[in-house]
Design a protein with these regions (language model features):
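Catalytic, metal-anchored helix/loop core of enzyme active sites in primary metabolism
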Residues: 1-388
Length: 388
């Protein structure tokens, strides 16, 4: 069997490191062609020594010399740096699939280039579909490229749809742990810190997505993702707070039946399923013990306390470049909150005000989306500055 060549965009992050564990378990099937990181040169070099890729890319050009020095005794591994290198490496002929696991807007252009180069896309970077869902889906159809979801929720929906047509979907059931502040009052939310928000009750993730989970913006992004991945309207996507995080999401069909995917919280499962689809491979890890589950609970989300979820619905219903503005403002306020420059409730207020001020474009091109991203970031930064 010819080994599939994988490029991992964001190999030092939470998804990237777990993807490498999947590769460790299936070295007979998969081989790493390229690893990339933002600025973690030590871990990237360590990964490169273990997996011996043809190339590594560090996005932060100031870290190039450090990475080069760490891999000085590995001359067969080519070392590159910068955004242009990231956008180019995904087009390399030997690559069969690209795991898009970079965080934020930075993952958009490499993913577009990978689609144009007809690489199978395993999508963990949700901002790509949030910002440019129509563009990405049109490109994927044009180039006959499959996009396999890596988010646990979208993988669960995808698995629930095996054997059924998208047209048979009545409703998507998108589950959500509720985050660490599910029981907090508005008054309590005013005083929570980034350290509080980073204590997610179920998943171990990167800092940015953990904050997004605390505000429920992450779930809002997943609503937008689901619209594009499964061809449904936002009104057909129902968010359910499910604190146990055992039901990862599901589908209600036109005949009233429901299919869902259950399992222990382990991101390696959706990563591996995206790699191996349509096959299902063995995976070492914990198994779900239903006898140990005393209850499975489901609640409606409170959009008054967590307005970011409502803002995401508003953005996708308005359409055009509004989801792009939503994402740009969110990246700004998320970083500000992590650096103690913004209170928890001010994140949603800033995002809402940014969306109101951003120039609307009903049919944005890629260039227009890049302009929207820059405009919305500037507006959000200005609003945060005015709050001081």
């Amino acid at each position: 069997m010819k080994k599939q060549q994988i490029c991992i965009l964001g190999s030092t992050g939470s998804i990237g490191t777990q993807a490498l564990d999947v590769v460790r378990q299936h070295r007979d099937r998969y081989e790493i062609y390229c690893l990339t990181a933002h600025r973690q040169v030590e871990l990237l070099a360590q990964q490169a020594r273990e997996f011996q890729p043809a190339a590594v890319v560090i996005a932060d050009e100031t870290r190039y010399e450090a990475l080069k020095a760490l891999l000085a005794d590995a001359p067969d591994i080519k070392v590159y740096a910068g955004a242009a290198a990231l956008e180019q490496i995904v087009t390399a002929d030997p690559i069969d699939m690209v795991l898009a696991a970079m965080v934020g807007f930075a993952g958009l252009l490499p993913t577009i280039n990978a689609i144009k180069a007809r690489k199978k896309i395993c999508l963990a970077n949700k901002e790509t579909l949030v910002v440019a869902g129509q563009l990405i889906c049109d490109l994927a159809r044009q180039h006959h490229v499959p996009i396999l979801p890596v988010d646990s929720e979208h993988s669960a929906i995808f698995q629930s749809l095996v054997g059924d047509a998208d047209a048979s979907i009545e409703k998507i059931l998108l589950t959500c742990s509720g985050g660490p502040f599910r029981h907090f009052t508005p008054g309590q939310l005013q005083h929570v810190t980034a350290a509080d928000a980073l204590k997610h009750p179920t998943w171990h993730m990167g800092d940015k997505i953990t904050i997004d989970s605390a505000t429920l913006m992450n779930k809002g992004f997943e609503v937008i993702e689901a619209k594009w991945l499964f061809g449904v309207e936002a009104s057909q996507i129902e968010v359910l707070i499910h604190p146990q995080s055992i039901v990862h999401s599901g589908v209600q069909f036109v005949d009233g039946s429901v299919k869902a995917q259950l399992g222990v919280p382990d991101m390696r499962l959706p990563i591996q399923y995206a790699f191996s689809f349509p096959e299902r491979l063995s995976l070492k890890g914990d198994r779900l013990n239903l006898f140990a589950q005393q209850k499975l609970e489901f609640f409606k989300p409170d959009m008054q306390r967590f307005p970011c979820l409502g803002l995401a619905y508003e953005a996708i219903q308005r359409g055009g470049n509004m989801p792009c503005a939503l994402n740009a403002a969110n990246e700004v306020v998320n970083e500000a909150f992590r650096n103690n420059r913004c209170a928890f409730p001010d994140m949603a207020r800033t995002i809402e005000a940014t969306m109101a001020k951003t120039t609307f474009d009903a049919l944005p091109s890629l260039e227009a989306l890049l302009q929207t991203d820059a405009e919305a970031r500037a507006i959000a930064r200005g609003l945060l500055g005015a709050m001081k």
